[in-house]
């Protein structure tokens, strides 16, 4: 099966055929760096990171850009509230975002353009829009004339009144039409600004992505992706700007949108006070469990985020890493099995891929428990294959990329491990002396410290209990 992706533009799953099979292009909308990103912001980078890896395997190369919005009124407000320079806000939270993504196993994109580094391209695109009569200057603002673009609304498929309500547009005296949106606006001395033909000012949010996508990927790109909340007005406006500036019929050939996260059944929002930041979550939970949870539902569907979901993800990874630990004697190199690739080819069906991963682990455990019924060579071959496929399936999903020992001991340091081993040895000595009361007391002491013991034919194994 070839790669098929759901195209929001056409509302259907379609075969993916890149303009240049030697190197597809993909642009994903990144964060506005005014605070720590919440877990909902991480779903896109995780999911579309899986897609990026798939495209590289399939085509041999990929040009992937994910932007940073580092000029925005939210950033200005944060700097004013905290009494620090704007650069202090953007540098701090840009670094935090990259660190959070690294912990979640998100590979960096090929290009991570920042808006402030692309002012010449942004200004040039606005000039093109004015020249082509798709934009106008009014009271030191430059605005896009929505009624100049006949295809406006083709992505969101909303009628004009619905679009006007959905955009929460500002009714301003400098607008010819309420639906027109800002490309450039004036800046006071206290706000960041750049010299332009229309005076000192700063760009609107939408034009930044259009200019950066064109600068790094060209006038027409293969895939443009982001959260469903960006479909309108942000992506709708990107299409209008880009097509009108370049005089082209297509800006992005495939539009992909990931669903939103709910928290404990309610919409995740600041007003409800139920925002969970990645920064806070990785301090409390294994980052790989957060990644697993983000992949557990199909990317286009809403995902109900909860402590129960995280706990279930931890338990699943315990089983997977436990299986790999039991396969330690069987050296193997990762091999991605066909059913994993088939699941991902089916519009990134990560839940199906995770189910296939669990099946591989179950098969391995059955083989491990049933070794007496087969010839040694046959068992070794089967377990080596299953381990290779387990590792390969994990590789395709960005999972199982650490050793079982690292997974089970995370949250501990060298002195902790020395202390734990000393107690395990003491428990072993107590059992040898048939002092089972003492042995049970040591097990209980370790449990109170968050350490779970497992007695196996190969000796005692321990793991840090994660929540």
From Swiss-Prot:
Its EC number(s): 6.1.1.16
Residues at which ATP binds: 270
Gene Ontology MF terms in the entry: ATP binding; cysteine-tRNA ligase activity; zinc ion binding
Biological processes, Gene Ontology terms: cysteinyl-tRNA aminoacylation
UniProt binding sites for Zn(2+): 29, 209, 234, 238
Record's cofactor remark: Binds 1 zinc ion per subunit.
Gene Ontology annotations for the cellular component aspect, listed alphabetically: cytosol
Motif 'KMSKS' region, residue numbers: 267-271
Principal location: cytoplasm
Subunit structure: Monomer.
Family: Belongs to the class-I aminoacyl-tRNA synthetase family.
Protein name: Cysteine--tRNA ligase
Organism, scientific name: Xylella fastidiosa (strain 9a5c)
Gene transcribed to yield this protein: cysS
């Amino acid at each position: 099966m070839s790669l098929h992706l759901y195209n929001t533009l056409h509302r259907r799953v379609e075969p993916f055929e890149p303009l240049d099979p030697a190197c597809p292009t993909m642009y994903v909308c990144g964060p506005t760096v005014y605070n720590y990103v919440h877990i909902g912001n991480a779903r896109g980078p995780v999911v579309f990171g899986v897609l990026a890896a798939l495209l590289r395997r399939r085509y041999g190369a990929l040009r992937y850009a994910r932007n940073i919005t580092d000029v925005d009124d939210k950033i200005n407000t944060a700097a004013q509230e905290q009494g620090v320079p704007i650069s202090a806000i953007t540098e701090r939270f840009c670094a935090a975002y990259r660190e959070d993504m690294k912990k979640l196993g998100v590979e960096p994109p090929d290009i991570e353009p920042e808006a402030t580094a692309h002012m010449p391209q942004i200004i040039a695109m606005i000039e093109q829009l004015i020249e082509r009569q798709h934009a106008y200057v009014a009271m030191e603002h430059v605005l896009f004339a929505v009624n100049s673009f006949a295809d406006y609304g083709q992505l969101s498929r909303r009628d004009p009144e619905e679009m006007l309500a959905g955009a929460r547009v500002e009714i301003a005296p400098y607008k010819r039409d309420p639906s027109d949106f800002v490309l450039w606006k004036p800046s006071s001395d206290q706000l960041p600004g750049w010299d332009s033909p229309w005076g000192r000012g700063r760009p609107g949010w939408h034009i930044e992505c259009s200019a950066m996508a064109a600068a790094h990927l060209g006038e027409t790109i293969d895939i443009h992706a982001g959260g469903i909340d960006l479909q309108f007005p942000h992506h709708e406006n990107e299409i209008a700007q880009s097509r009108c500036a370049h005089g082209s019929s297509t800006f992005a050939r495939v539009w992909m949108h990931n669903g939103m996260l709910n928290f404990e059944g309610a919409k995740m929002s600041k007003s409800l006070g139920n925002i969970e930041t990645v920064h806070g979550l990785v301090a409390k939970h294994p980052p790989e469990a957060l990644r697993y949870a983000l992949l557990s539902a199909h990317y286009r569907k809403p995902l109900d985020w909860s402590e129960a979901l995280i706990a279930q993800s931890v338990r699943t990874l315990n089983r997977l890493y436990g299986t790999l630990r039991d396969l330690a004697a069987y050296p193997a190199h990762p091999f991605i099995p066909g059913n994993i690739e088939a699941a991902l080819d089916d519009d990134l069906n990560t839940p199906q891929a995770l189910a296939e991963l669990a099946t591989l682990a179950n098969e391995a455990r059955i083989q491990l428990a049933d070794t007496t019924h087969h010839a040694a060579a046959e068992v070794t071959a089967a377990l080596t294959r299953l381990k290779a496929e387990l590792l390969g399936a994990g590789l395709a999903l960005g999972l199982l990329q650490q050793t079982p020992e690292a997974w089970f001991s995370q949250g501990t340091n060298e002195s902790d491990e020395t202390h734990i081993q000393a107690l395990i040895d003491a428990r072993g000595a107590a059992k040898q002396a048939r002092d089972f009361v003492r042995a049970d007391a040591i097990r209980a002491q370790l449990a109170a410290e968050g350490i779970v013991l497992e007695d196996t034919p190969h000796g005692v194994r321990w793991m840090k209990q994660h929540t």
